[in-house]
Swiss-Prot record:
The chain crosses the membrane at residues 418-438. It is found in: Endoplasmic reticulum membrane; Endoplasmic reticulum-Golgi intermediate compartment membrane; Cytoplasmic vesicle, Secretory vesicle, Synaptic vesicle membrane; Cytoplasmic vesicle, Clathrin-coated vesicle membrane. Glycans are attached at N167, N258, N271, N294, N301, N348, N355, N404. Residues 439-468 are cytoplasmic. Keywords: Cytoplasmic vesicle, Disulfide bond, Endoplasmic reticulum, Glycoprotein, Hydrogen ion transport, Ion transport, Membrane, Signal, Synapse, Transmembrane, Transmembrane helix, Transport. This is V-type proton ATPase subunit S1. Accessory component of the multisubunit proton-transporting vacuolar (V)-ATPase protein pump. Interacts (via N-terminus) with ATP6AP2 (via N-terminus). Interacts with RNASEK. Interacts with TMEM106B (via C-terminus).
Length: 468
């Protein structure tokens, strides 16, 4: 009997194989179905009785889909620092459009199908709403919570919850299933959502009466509505209808030397790097914004200023940088000009000198340059006295002012950019070429002359005798 059954199965398999070969479109259908499944998104609403668990989501604008990796970055702070009791309200179907269609989005709170949920979000110290979460991330959410909490999910209803004795120090994962229209017969979607909202309200009231801290999440297994095609707007390419918070770039705080009266010297750079031999060190974080920066030896008066920066452990020894500036009056321009005469590096009793006389400007201004470096490819504004030098220095967005500092701010900057830059030369040459063409054409027009003599056909004709 078993042999006959096996033989029948083998014969059936031989019949199915040619049939599958006659359907080459079947793999394409499977791939399309898998792609459609991967594009399904559902909302995720998180709230907790503890505060400060979530920062505002940076990419929850229109079209962004939260992946499983991004979701873990949102959940980890709540699971590691928040309450140990986690509630997961899981519906069969839910879409972000349900909140728009049945929620009190226009101020009509009495007609909202999510009154208890809205009240919980308003009162929660921490909350986070993710409009679109990838279906795969939601499908593995229960397993992820179980691994992070170290507790098996417990399927409960309202009656079971009232009998449970939860402890704030013992982790617990409570799973509450909520129905939707697919399992509610002839009930309208709004009525089902209102019933689910009542269940959420009763569960939260039970926890509140027992004074149990918790973290809750509301999501669904699959979306209730067919999502429109967002393939062209994922990853931040879509129109962002809501204003996004723009994080300003971090700016280094300038180094300031103050005497007993006021701020005298200001020094700033976006990047400050120094090299000894082939080894480079970035001193930006050790220089700007440092409260205990060693400025011992700095000096200032009306004609000479010296800014001294000392680092205790740089390349295994103490290294000191000295910026020496001079302020002089020039009768030709009838104003004072400052010059960074030298930049000195003191280390192990030796001194390396760099000529920086190109760092100059009117003393009422500061000096700014995109690159101030001892390397040739960056302009070579710092020229070492000895070649080759073991020391190399590079400043990016360099700015310094040692005279006429007011209100602890840089004055107007005299930039190192030359007037005859490549772009300016291109514009000048093009303009001169077009001017030459215009001048040549005008000269040709002015040189045109009309004939003042014409052939008179009434006069005697000219006869040419042919000589053979």
């Amino acid at each position: 009997m078993m042999a006959a059954t096996a033989a029948a199965q083998v014969r059936a398999g031989t019949r199915w194989a040619p049939a599958l070969c006659r359907m080459p479109w079947l793999p394409l259908m499977l791939v399309a179905a898998a792609a459609a499944t991967s594009e399904q998104q559902v909302p995720l609403v998180l709230w907790s009785s503890d505060r400060g668990l979530w920062a505002p989501a940076a990419d929850t604008h229109e079209g962004h889909i939260t992946s499983d990796m991004q979701l873990s970055t949102y959940l980890d702070p709540a699971l590691e620092l928040g309450p140990r009791n986690v509630l997961l309200f899981l519906q069969d179907k839910l879409s972000i459009e349900d909140f728009t269609a049945y929620g009190g989005v226009f101020g009509n709170k009495q007609d909202s199908a999510f009154s208890n949920l809205e009240n919980a979000l308003d009162l929660a110290p921490s909350s986070l709403v993710l409009p679109a979460v990838d279906w795969y991330a939601i499908s593995t959410l229960t397993t992820y919570l179980q691994e992070k909490l170290g507790a098996s999910p417990l399927h409960v209803d309202l009656a079971t919850l009232q009998e449970l004795k939860l402890n704030a120090s013992i982790p617990a994962l409570l799973l509450i299933r909520l129905p939707y229209t697919a399992s509610s017969g002839l009930m309208a979607p709004k009525e089902v959502l209102m019933g689910n909202d009542e269940v959420i309200g009763q569960v939260l009231s039970t926890l509140k009466s027992e004074d149990i801290p918790y973290t809750a999440a509301l999501t669904a297994v699959r979306p209730s509505r067919v999502a429109r095609d967002v393939a062209m707007v994922t990853g931040g390419l879509g129109r962002q209808l809501l204003q996004r918070t723009v994080v300003p770039p971090t700016m280094n705080v300038p180094v300031s030397y103050n005497d007993s009266y006021d701020t005298r010297i200001l020094f700033w750079a976006q990047n400050f790097s120094v090299a000894y031999g082939e080894h480079w060190e970035d001193l930006t974080s050790r220089t700007f914004g440092v409260q205990d920066l060693n400025l011992t030896g700095s000096f200032w008066n009306d004609t000479v200023a010296r800014l001294v920066l000392t680092y205790d452990s740089l390349f295994g020894t103490m290294v000191t940088f000295k910026f020496i500036l001079a302020n002089s009056y020039y009768s030709v321009s009838a104003r004072h000009w400052f010059t960074l005469e030298n930049l000195e590096i003191h280390s192990n009793g030796s001194v390396a000198y760099f000529n920086a006389s190109q760092v100059t400007g009117p003393s009422i201004y500061s000096f700014h340059c995109e690159h101030v470096s001892s390397e040739n490819e960056d302009g070579n504004l710092l020229v070492p006295d000895t070649q080759p030098s073991l020391w190399q220095m590079t400043f990016r967005d360099f700015q310094i002012q040692a005279f006429n500092v007011t209100d602890k701010k840089f004055s107007y900057a005299s930039d190192c950019a030359g007037f005859f830059s490549p772009g300016i030369w291109m514009g000048l040459l093009t303009s001169l070429f077009m001017l030459f063409i215009f001048t040549y054409g005008l000269h040709m027009i002015l040189s045109l002359k009309t004939m003042d003599r014409f052939d008179d056909h009434k006069g005697p004709t000219i006869t040419l005798t042919q000589i053979v």
